[in-house]
């Protein structure tokens, strides 16, 4: 996992890491931070640090780390619910965040120097001078896999030898409604800590969950609301 900013890990992050230790007791867990990751390697990483956009720095860092080292990666707001051992036979795996978007923060893994991870990293090339702002990982991750044959349908599939899993595997928590849909195939739950958002935005998303649940349960209301905007 990545943890930049020199701040102590939040209690929720510690609980998630405890779940990793529980379900994968024989795995080595490594923290990547300013001491073992070169934050000055390009303009993009320097800009992310200077502007305290640590979540976007982690988006980039995780790809470079897994390309060079191999292994599994999870954000610190991801809780494991079972062992990752069945995934060790995969050359690489990724997961849908929505039916159309891939997000490596949910959890992903790959052998060292896997070409798809390298290609994902290459999507950052236009941003490396640090003069063009930041782009969230779902957009860039999905962009790379679409170029390699991904079908944006939310279904399990194989892309150039890598497994791509549906939402139920790594994203069973519906952040908009606050509902959790764990199944027998679920490996992990992404709790959406939203460390890259300001507190007001995070609070607003929590306050609107009852409305999103209502709209999800009553499609006719959703249609009326949409039509009235």
PLM feature segments, named:
Residues 1-58, 74-229:
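Glycosyltransferase-associated regions of secretory-pathway enzymes
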Residues 60-71:
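Small-residue hinge/turn detector
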